[in-house]
Design a protein with these regions (language model features):
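Glycine-rich hexapeptide-repeat left-handed beta-helix
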Residues: 1-105
Length: 105
């Protein structure tokens, strides 16, 4: 959670990552619907608003801005700007298959 700003009563569940460096080490920009806003920084985590809850093992990518009173569910990988009072859930399809050739080693 380096180089990040956490609001009053913001909560990060176990294993949450607020990433602060891009993989290619280039300048971090905040991505908005109106375009990117350059920060001039190579290390910049996230801004997390007051009373926001981020669930276990979520990953918040560099330059993300999370509004106040938001909820990000466990396992979400988020990048961008999340408006105040928003909620993000991960939708995934699980496929359960039967195992064949189950034997003792």
């Amino acid at each position: 959670m380096g180089d990040s700003i956490l609001g009053y009563h913001a909560h990060l569940g176990a294993g949450v990552i607020l990433s602060n460096v891009k993989l290619d080490h280039s300048e971090i920009a905040v991505s908005t619907p109106d375009g990117d806003i350059p920060t001039g920084l190579r290390k910049f985590g996230a801004i997390v608003g007051d009373r926001t809850e981020i669930g276990c093992n979520a990953v918040i990518n560099p330059g993300s801005v999370i509004g106040r009173d938001c909820m990000i569910y466990p396992g979400v990988n988020f990048r961008g700007v999340l408006p105040h009072g928003s909620m993000v859930k991960l939708l995934q399809d699980l496929q359960v298959l039967s195992r064949r050739n189950i034997g003792l080693a």
